[in-house]
Amino acid sequence: SSRQREVLQLVAEGKSTKEIASILTVTVKTVEFHKTRIMRELRLRSAAELTKYAISEGLTTIH
């Protein structure tokens, strides 16, 4: 979903769950739900793998 894409991009940028919740004006639980779904769908096991995926898909860049 577009919301999952937003969460993925913010995770890849190094934002914390709390920061993401604040930016998207949702609860921390909602952010955790999206992160869990993304990781399950992509068969990823860590935030590092999530970041690597986001970079490879062009959702974020390394500064």
Identify the residue ranges that each predicted region occupies:
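The N-cap/first-turn positions of alpha helices
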Residues: 3-4
